[in-house]
């Protein structure tokens, strides 16, 4: 980074608070302005069409997707009890209705990363198959699960760097085709995620450093082999577009509940942000399908506010939290990314309404509250969105519209967390809430 630190601190006073690990709220002054965005609605529809072509394959290889006919769909759940408890804990009013977009329940890898990660694997598999064989777009893609294609895919490799969930989604999908699959994992990655990948035949390379280093190492290694495809969490267009297709899905889910976003009926969408690719893709997808009334809010740990910092300063991926002496350490492993993606900040410059940072303790509290009130279990980083609701309500200028507001908290992962691990998360949350611990019944 070439910018003078002292000049940055003077120009953006909130950076001083961020350096002290204080929770901050930032409203993007450029939100809603006109801007050129390098993605289109046609590309989102292309993603949806590709997912549809692969539905027979996914239903064949991953039977859990059969109930949705091979589609990756998660429920949108109204969580009245959690809303009431959240308001009570914060001694605040939360006008409107709160929903959970439960990507934590997505089939295959149980996280938001299923959308982008699996999509990019599918697109690469389609490229190999249509290039090397007579496969056409009108064929039944279930044929890709046959030994003939498995043998073909075994000549190719897929590689990625990850803190955990992206590696899980890509690893499980790529291994199902027979690709030689390698996941470079950062020091923050949970052991159970590494174990699960290895159990699925994936090679895991462990790094005693940040995910940025793991990604760089993976990128360098993949470049040496022309048959190895690297999925780049810091700059992949296909990852971004894979996430964006959810805009089509949630538009229908909202409409089914009588929710049609506009200026008088705002829909706030609270998204945990790590490298920023998945929340940016989701935000773009929602706003391309519903151009009015969508207010994306990113939530990041106070110790790793990389996307907020990059957007606030307009330095985007050119600044890392460590440049300001922030340690980058958090128990929200999926959010432990010291530098934002090359795509996220630039695309979100006018699409992001605001950002909030939180302490790790808060996400454990909300994790436990969600389990107690709604019987829904998520991993720590997936509870991050709850931390941003009250600050966003307080900051929102159009107070009259708040009574018609819809708040969508994006639960980004949790389905695959082992029971003993989830119990530890829950116990920590109950302890922080100063309440008796219970045994979970998932």
From Swiss-Prot:
Gene3D superfamilies: 3.40.50.1100. Keywords: Lyase, Pyridoxal phosphate. It is an enzyme of class 4 (lyase). It comes from the Bacteria. It comes from Limosilactobacillus fermentum (strain NBRC 3956 / LMG 18251). The modification N6-(pyridoxal phosphate)lysine is found at residue 113. GO terms for biological process: D-serine catabolic process; isoleucine biosynthetic process. Belongs to the serine/threonine dehydratase family. DsdA subfamily. HAMAP family: D_Ser_dehydrat. One of its GO terms (molecular function) is hydro-lyase activity. Its EC number is 4.3.1.18. Its cofactor is pyridoxal 5'-phosphate. This is Probable D-serine dehydratase. It catalyses: D-serine = pyruvate + NH4(+).
